[in-house]
Amino acid sequence: MGSSHIGASNVPVTPWNFLSLLDYQSDLISSKAVVIPVPYDGTASYRAGAREGPWAVIQASRELEDYDPELDWEPSQMGIYTAPPLEPHMAGPEHMLERVRRAVGTLAQGEDVV
């Protein structure tokens, strides 16, 4: 887990992104992967809360080891950009899905999408 510095006092802070990557590991231009948080639970029939999922995944990722011993590889080496969370579209899941498609299309710029 890395740290960044903010402000004139250079107070160390932990980056708020997937795996807590430093700026050079997580900028949009050079990253090969993008995480798009989609906080949406517009169709919850019992209890809302799915919208907290992206936050929980990013929070948990901050505790992960960034090394895969089987592959002898660190995913952060490819760069992973964490996009800002998408604003929920409460008109229904079709509208939210279209919002996700637009965001993915904008970020992918012709690259492969998984």
Which residues does each PLM region occupy?
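Metal-dependent C-N hydrolase catalytic cores
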Residues: 2-114
